[in-house]
Amino acid sequence: MAQLHDYRDRYYDGSGGGWHPLTNFNKSSTASGRIDLGRKKGREDAANIISNLARDKNNNIVETIKIITHSMGGAYGNGFVQGLKDYIKTLPIEQQKQIKITLVADFDPYGAGDIIADPDIKTLQFKHKNDLNIFGMGWLANENESGLSKENIRTNTGTSTDHSIFTFFNDISSLSEGTYKWNGSKWEKQ
């Protein structure tokens, strides 16, 4: 994650083990199921994630948490954030104030219509849309997440409309490191 100057990244399988329609119908097959799986994992890993955040010489947390998702991972990541926040609420108030989730970036989130963006966190959605791009699956993930303004949803209908994460490198390069704050009408970088 050099783009965000974050070198202690973690990777999770947001599909919950994959979708296998011919062999089973598990939680991973629906957005709500993946949200539940993500929330459980977020709660489970929160203490470890927080204990490993960078600190200054006074032991104050100086590193932020950023969530980057793709496809089925969008719903999983949404639940993961909920799980992190559930855990953070159990901590002393002074520590809660130090822990910041500063960005969620969802790339072609599958089932986005069932995702409600957290209003306390800057969230960006990137989509590649082309219903005629059959083999590149440009038709697959074209719903908007609830709670996002039009300026936080970026849709490419031209140069690249494939669903693959590899086609989102230009979008990834637009992500900006920093902390964002809601000013009442839009997110502002601090």
Give the label of every model feature segment:
Residues Y7, Y11-Y12, W19, Y76, ...:
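Sequence-level detector for tyrosine residue identity
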